């Protein structure tokens, strides 16, 4: 689960991490009060969306002006003007795609006198089962670009969970950033606090970009992105309360209500499969035959008729779907249950696109019989290869 920048900074503040003061606003009329409380003389007006690249982004609406999603203001009136322009406008960044995201909240933050910008992040290293630090002197940039163009400017290391964070980890960060004396001590303290916060809140990723050294000689987290392990949210009611569903895909939210593993993709073939491995193989073979999947959808091993019906409705709610492939290998999951769910869903929501069904395994004959006698226009398939070819040909011929 992701949260907004201002929320992430509030979490960091709980652990004593140095961040700038600021106030979130949801209406343009709140901008003046926020700016006045901060006092100036310089403010930063930041769009709050779950996407990076805000500063270099562009708004779709001409009324929002030609500046990006992060703007420097030198007067209270300028803060008010930017708030009026940016709120409820659509911001397009490298991470939002061409559709962009509507800005429904802003963060008014005090300005900082920046001397240097750095990059610092913590993430779960799946290969070592440890927390990894990634550090670079190239802050304020896309770390992917730095890794591609100047990989030698990136330093990374992992923390042994048996010992936890230690002073030498802080020194490693300070050395990587070229910090000495008091600034090196600040880096050691910062690293300890970030690691403590990461563990305490069950984060998956914490990115500070940029981490800045101010002209006053202080380290400060100027931006913060946080992602949390969804499996741990039951023990973090405070974090759950920060969820902004308007930033999430509506179909993915609906799928989560039924414990369906659903991810929206950008293709045209909807997929319903049981098992993550089979789902990925199904997507691969669709690509092999020249088309792209519209989603990843794993209904799991013990899906009910109602769960299958919900899954089918979610797929058909995507206007980009031009055909649907259902690929079920029944082990725990019974093929007749899948068939009943599909028939019920089609009768309820209708079917305007080709549908190919491949069933194999437990109660397969009963499942095929249910579909055959349903009166629905369904193309049966004998195996995965046959199913993929049939759905691709059906969509191309539609």
UniProtKB/Swiss-Prot annotation:
Its cofactor is Mg(2+). It holds the Pfam family ATP-grasp_2. It comes from the Bacteria. One of its GO terms (biological process) is tricarboxylic acid cycle. ATP binds at residues 46, 53-55, 109, 112, 117. Its EC number is 6.2.1.5. InterPro entries: ATP-grasp, ATP-grasp_succ-CoA_synth-type, ATP_grasp_subdomain_1, SUCC_ACL_C, Succ_CoA_ligase-like_bsu, Succinyl-CoA_synth-like. It catalyses: succinate + ATP + CoA = succinyl-CoA + ADP + phosphate; GTP + succinate + CoA = succinyl-CoA + GDP + phosphate. Keywords: ATP-binding, Ligase, Magnesium, Metal-binding, Nucleotide-binding, Tricarboxylic acid cycle. Mg(2+) binds at residues 209, 223. Pathway: Carbohydrate metabolism; tricarboxylic acid cycle; succinate from succinyl-CoA (ligase route): step 1/1. Residues 9-254 form the ATP-grasp domain. One of its GO terms (cellular component) is cytosol. PANTHER family: SUCCINATE--COA LIGASE [GDP-FORMING] SUBUNIT BETA, MITOCHONDRIAL (PTHR11815:SF10), SUCCINYL-COA SYNTHETASE BETA CHAIN (PTHR11815). This is Succinate--CoA ligase [ADP-forming] subunit beta. It comes from Rhodopseudomonas palustris (strain HaA2). The gene is sucC.
